[in-house]
């Protein structure tokens, strides 16, 4: 279990959020329903999806590094 109030927990949450929104961008129904707004509270989902799709290599390497950290070091 990862605590959200610690730095590593916040990083895990942010990475999972970005990866989930990038996945939502690939699914047509979810894209039209969730990622249609670009401003406001719902715009956070759109911005996370853009980060996940444009920086997919950096995000995937970060996910692998964070998984290694959580499983073996922490």
UniProtKB/Swiss-Prot annotation:
One of its GO terms (cellular component) is Golgi membrane. This is Protein kish-B. InterPro entries: Kish-B, Ksh1. Involved in the early part of the secretory pathway. It is a single-pass type I membrane protein. Belongs to the KISH family. Residues 1-22 form the signal peptide. It comes from Xenopus tropicalis (Western clawed frog). It comes from the Eukaryota. Residues 74 are cytoplasmic. The keyword Transmembrane helix applies. Keywords: Golgi apparatus, Membrane, Signal, Transmembrane, Transmembrane helix. It is found in: Golgi apparatus membrane. Pfam families: DUF1242 (PF06842). Residues 23-52 are extracellular. The chain crosses the membrane at residues 53-73.
